[in-house]
Protein backbone atom coordinates (compact mmCIF):
# COMPACT_ATOMS: atom_id res chain seq x y z
CA UNK A 1 0.00 0.00 0.00
CA UNK A 2 2.78 2.43 0.86
CA UNK A 3 5.04 1.74 -2.12
CA UNK A 4 3.89 4.88 -3.97
CA UNK A 5 5.80 7.11 -1.56
CA UNK A 6 8.21 4.73 0.17
CA UNK A 7 9.06 2.24 -2.55
CA UNK A 8 8.90 -1.52 -2.82
CA UNK A 9 10.73 -3.97 -0.57
CA UNK A 10 13.70 -3.97 -2.93
CA UNK A 11 13.92 -0.16 -2.71
CA UNK A 12 14.43 -0.42 1.05
CA UNK A 13 17.07 -3.15 1.08
CA UNK A 14 20.66 -2.07 1.58
CA UNK A 15 22.15 -5.55 1.65
CA UNK A 16 21.37 -9.25 1.89
CA UNK A 17 23.18 -12.43 2.75
CA UNK A 18 21.79 -15.47 1.01
CA UNK A 19 22.49 -19.14 0.50
CA UNK A 20 22.20 -20.38 -3.08
CA UNK A 21 20.72 -23.76 -3.99
CA UNK A 22 24.23 -25.27 -4.18
CA UNK A 23 25.12 -24.00 -0.68
CA UNK A 24 27.21 -20.97 -1.66
CA UNK A 25 26.88 -17.97 0.67
CA UNK A 26 26.54 -14.65 -1.16
CA UNK A 27 26.61 -11.11 0.21
CA UNK A 28 24.94 -8.56 -2.02
CA UNK A 29 24.57 -4.81 -1.65
CA UNK A 30 26.20 -2.71 0.97
CA UNK A 31 25.57 0.25 3.20
CA UNK A 32 24.44 2.60 0.44
CA UNK A 33 21.32 2.61 -1.73
CA UNK A 34 23.16 3.72 -4.87
CA UNK A 35 25.67 0.91 -5.41
CA UNK A 36 26.87 0.99 -9.02
CA UNK A 37 26.64 -2.72 -9.89
CA UNK A 38 23.87 -4.82 -11.43
CA UNK A 39 20.77 -4.92 -9.24
CA UNK A 40 21.30 -8.48 -8.03
CA UNK A 41 19.42 -7.72 -4.80
CA UNK A 42 16.42 -6.74 -6.91
CA UNK A 43 16.68 -10.01 -8.84
CA UNK A 44 16.91 -12.04 -5.62
CA UNK A 45 14.04 -10.14 -3.99
CA UNK A 46 11.89 -10.58 -7.08
CA UNK A 47 12.61 -14.30 -7.21
CA UNK A 48 10.82 -14.72 -3.85
CA UNK A 49 13.05 -17.58 -2.73
CA UNK A 50 13.43 -19.42 -6.03
CA UNK A 51 17.12 -18.55 -6.43
CA UNK A 52 18.20 -18.96 -2.82
CA UNK A 53 17.33 -18.48 0.83
CA UNK A 54 17.91 -15.07 2.36
CA UNK A 55 19.56 -15.50 5.76
CA UNK A 56 20.24 -11.85 6.67
CA UNK A 57 19.05 -8.43 5.51
CA UNK A 58 20.22 -4.86 6.04
CA UNK A 59 17.28 -2.48 5.73
CA UNK A 60 16.80 1.22 5.35
CA UNK A 61 14.86 2.39 8.42
CA UNK A 62 12.60 5.42 8.20
CA UNK A 63 11.23 7.47 11.05
CA UNK A 64 7.49 7.04 11.62
CA UNK A 65 5.60 10.11 10.37
CA UNK A 66 4.18 12.43 13.04
CA UNK A 67 0.67 12.27 11.55
CA UNK A 68 -1.15 9.79 9.34
CA UNK A 69 -4.69 10.42 8.07
CA UNK A 70 -6.77 8.93 5.31
CA UNK A 71 -9.58 9.96 3.01
CA UNK A 72 -12.26 7.52 1.89
CA UNK A 73 -13.63 8.82 -1.41
CA UNK A 74 -16.62 7.40 -3.28
CA UNK A 75 -17.34 7.86 -7.00
CA UNK A 76 -20.37 7.10 -9.17
CA UNK A 77 -18.16 5.74 -11.96
CA UNK A 78 -14.71 4.18 -12.22
CA UNK A 79 -13.56 6.56 -14.97
CA UNK A 80 -13.87 9.58 -12.69
CA UNK A 81 -12.07 7.73 -9.91
CA UNK A 82 -9.24 6.80 -12.26
CA UNK A 83 -8.93 10.40 -13.40
CA UNK A 84 -8.81 11.56 -9.77
CA UNK A 85 -5.79 9.32 -9.09
CA UNK A 86 -3.88 10.95 -11.94
CA UNK A 87 -5.03 14.42 -10.88
CA UNK A 88 -3.62 13.97 -7.35
CA UNK A 89 -0.20 12.93 -8.69
CA UNK A 90 -0.27 15.67 -11.36
CA UNK A 91 -0.80 18.20 -8.56
CA UNK A 92 2.57 17.16 -7.12
CA UNK A 93 1.07 15.33 -4.14
CA UNK A 94 2.61 11.94 -3.38
CA UNK A 95 0.34 10.15 -0.91
CA UNK A 96 1.77 7.61 1.52
CA UNK A 97 -0.75 5.21 0.00
CA UNK A 98 -3.53 5.26 -2.56
CA UNK A 99 -5.76 2.33 -3.52
CA UNK A 100 -8.83 2.05 -5.73
CA UNK A 101 -11.65 -0.51 -5.50
CA UNK A 102 -14.63 -1.22 -7.75
CA UNK A 103 -18.25 -1.71 -6.67
CA UNK A 104 -18.03 -5.49 -6.28
CA UNK A 105 -14.95 -5.23 -4.05
CA UNK A 106 -16.50 -2.36 -2.05
CA UNK A 107 -19.63 -4.33 -1.17
CA UNK A 108 -17.79 -7.59 -0.51
CA UNK A 109 -15.28 -5.83 1.77
CA UNK A 110 -18.05 -3.94 3.57
CA UNK A 111 -19.93 -7.19 4.24
CA UNK A 112 -16.71 -8.70 5.58
CA UNK A 113 -15.15 -5.82 7.56
CA UNK A 114 -17.84 -3.15 8.19
CA UNK A 115 -15.32 -0.44 7.33
CA UNK A 116 -17.92 2.25 6.57
CA UNK A 117 -17.56 2.10 2.78
CA UNK A 118 -20.24 3.83 0.67
CA UNK A 119 -22.29 0.89 -0.64
CA UNK A 120 -23.77 2.76 -3.58
CA UNK A 121 -20.40 3.82 -4.98
CA UNK A 122 -19.13 2.36 -8.26
CA UNK A 123 -15.55 3.07 -7.19
CA UNK A 124 -13.73 3.92 -3.99
CA UNK A 125 -10.33 5.49 -3.45
CA UNK A 126 -8.47 5.42 -0.15
CA UNK A 127 -5.80 8.11 0.06
CA UNK A 128 -3.37 8.18 2.99
CA UNK A 129 -1.33 11.30 3.72
CA UNK A 130 1.46 11.52 6.27
CA UNK A 131 3.99 13.96 7.67
CA UNK A 132 3.88 16.89 10.10
CA UNK A 133 0.30 17.61 11.26
CA UNK A 134 0.11 21.08 9.68
CA UNK A 135 1.32 19.72 6.34
CA UNK A 136 -1.15 16.83 6.43
CA UNK A 137 -4.03 19.23 7.16
CA UNK A 138 -3.12 21.29 4.07
CA UNK A 139 -2.70 18.18 1.90
CA UNK A 140 -6.09 16.85 2.98
CA UNK A 141 -7.73 20.10 1.85
CA UNK A 142 -5.96 19.91 -1.53
CA UNK A 143 -6.75 16.23 -2.09
CA UNK A 144 -10.40 16.69 -1.10
CA UNK A 145 -10.72 19.59 -3.57
CA UNK A 146 -9.10 17.51 -6.34
CA UNK A 147 -11.40 14.57 -5.63
CA UNK A 148 -14.52 16.74 -5.63
CA UNK A 149 -13.43 18.42 -8.88
CA UNK A 150 -13.04 14.95 -10.43
CA UNK A 151 -16.62 14.08 -9.45
CA UNK A 152 -16.41 12.47 -6.00
CA UNK A 153 -19.86 11.63 -4.64
CA UNK A 154 -18.64 11.27 -1.04
CA UNK A 155 -15.55 12.14 0.99
CA UNK A 156 -14.89 10.91 4.51
CA UNK A 157 -11.72 11.94 6.39
CA UNK A 158 -10.39 9.80 9.23
CA UNK A 159 -10.68 11.50 12.60
CA UNK A 160 -8.55 9.01 14.53
CA UNK A 161 -5.90 6.33 14.10
CA UNK A 162 -8.58 3.70 14.68
CA UNK A 163 -10.74 5.08 11.87
CA UNK A 164 -7.75 5.27 9.50
CA UNK A 165 -6.95 1.63 10.29
CA UNK A 166 -10.59 0.69 9.68
CA UNK A 167 -10.49 2.28 6.20
CA UNK A 168 -7.47 0.09 5.39
CA UNK A 169 -8.92 -3.00 7.10
CA UNK A 170 -11.69 -3.02 4.52
CA UNK A 171 -9.20 -2.80 1.65
CA UNK A 172 -6.96 -5.49 3.11
CA UNK A 173 -9.96 -7.80 3.50
CA UNK A 174 -11.12 -7.34 -0.11
CA UNK A 175 -9.39 -10.50 -1.37
CA UNK A 176 -10.84 -12.90 1.24
CA UNK A 177 -14.18 -11.07 1.03
CA UNK A 178 -14.47 -11.60 -2.73
CA UNK A 179 -13.26 -15.17 -2.19
CA UNK A 180 -16.38 -15.79 -0.07
CA UNK A 181 -18.53 -14.83 -3.05
CA UNK A 182 -16.50 -16.82 -5.57
CA UNK A 183 -14.18 -19.45 -4.07
CA UNK A 184 -12.45 -19.92 -7.44
CA UNK A 185 -11.55 -16.23 -7.53
CA UNK A 186 -8.16 -15.54 -9.15
CA UNK A 187 -6.28 -12.40 -8.15
CA UNK A 188 -3.53 -10.97 -10.32
CA UNK A 189 -1.49 -7.83 -9.82
CA UNK A 190 -1.73 -5.54 -12.78
CA UNK A 191 0.04 -2.38 -13.80
CA UNK A 192 -1.90 0.34 -15.57
CA UNK A 193 -0.35 3.67 -16.59
CA UNK A 194 -2.03 6.47 -14.60
CA UNK A 195 -3.10 8.27 -17.76
CA UNK A 196 -5.09 5.15 -18.79
CA UNK A 197 -6.93 4.67 -15.46
CA UNK A 198 -10.01 6.65 -16.61
CA UNK A 199 -10.40 4.20 -19.51
Indicate where each model-derived feature is located.
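FAD-binding subdomain of flavoenzyme oxidoreductases
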Residues: 1-99
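C-terminal substrate-recognition/cap domain of FAD-linked oxidoreductases
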Residues: 59-63, 69-199
Amino acid sequence: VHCLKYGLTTNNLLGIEMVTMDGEILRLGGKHLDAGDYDLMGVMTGSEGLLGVVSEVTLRILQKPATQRALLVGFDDTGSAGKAVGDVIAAGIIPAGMEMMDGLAINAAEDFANAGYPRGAAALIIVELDGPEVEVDVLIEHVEAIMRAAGASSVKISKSEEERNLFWAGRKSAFPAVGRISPDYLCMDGTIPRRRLPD
